[in-house]
Amino acid sequence: RSAWTGQQRFGTVLWSGDIEASWETLRKQIAAGLHFSASGLPFWTVDIGAFFVKNGNLWFWKGHYDAGTEDLGYRELFVRWYQWASFRYSAGMEQTAEENFGILKIQKSLFMMFLYK
């Protein structure tokens, strides 16, 4: 989540940290990745899809999709996030257990839906 001057020589992998699911957050993640790369830190990754529900007091659990994977808006955001992240050398998904179950449940049909349109 953090870096310092000279870290480039160690070839470390950086991650943007826990984030909320919103189009604004995705936009900021793209800019953050460009900034990291421009500063000589190309090994940077992101959590695909982010946290989509308002579930607790943690600052990153402020997603805009309380219906989760049933929300067509979140499905669109998730696919666009995945498309962008596929150009990264490394990317993963980090959600709560409740969110992961929903994503795994719809992931195949979601990708097939967008793949053949």
Regions inferred by a protein language model and the residue ranges of each:
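Catalytic-domain carbohydrate-binding cleft regions of carbohydrate-active enzymes
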Residues: 1-117
